[in-house]
Amino acid sequence: VPAAAPPADPAALTERLKAQAYGVGFDLAGVAALGVPDSVGHFDAWLAAGHHGSMGYLDGAGAELRRDSRRPHPGATHALVVALDYGGREPAGPVARYARGDDYHEVLRDKLRTLHAWFEAQVGAPVDGRPYVDSGPLLERDLARRAGLGWFGKNTMLINPGRGSFFFLGALVLAWPLVPDAPFEADRCGRCTRCLDACPTQAF
């Protein structure tokens, strides 16, 4: 079935999509255009230094896919990028906070599939797309920064001004024109080194 023509006001559709993302339970939502990641140079340097170790899937063909977010799903042009808080302010314990609930891959993927179905209903036609939740060749933190969700902290995590970094990231890539959000350009860390100083293994 051929896809319907894009709506006259893609900005309004984009805003409705983000509002629906909040409606299904996500804590942050933004839109980014797919393309060459801003951090691709850091990624290549990381590979060249051998930091991927035995994770061979990150090199070769896997690296080529990650060097341009349009490659994993040809035809897709934009991504809805979302974040879901996992309760990182709960008391510490023997199990990492992010692992205490249901499998986050399934939780986020189900919500993204719900959004995909909602989007198709809004435009009245099938829309090619796919959800990604830490399970495909996308540099999700880079996409999230480009979608305005936060900045890269000195702890290498994406930090949001209102929510910190205790959240999962996911993306719904769509072959449909949307209006991207402004990327998060500021570096709010400044001279702060609290995360570096607190790390017990000096891993950073």
Model-derived regions: residue spans:
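Auxiliary alpha/beta "docking" domains used to position bulky ligands
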Residues: V1-R188
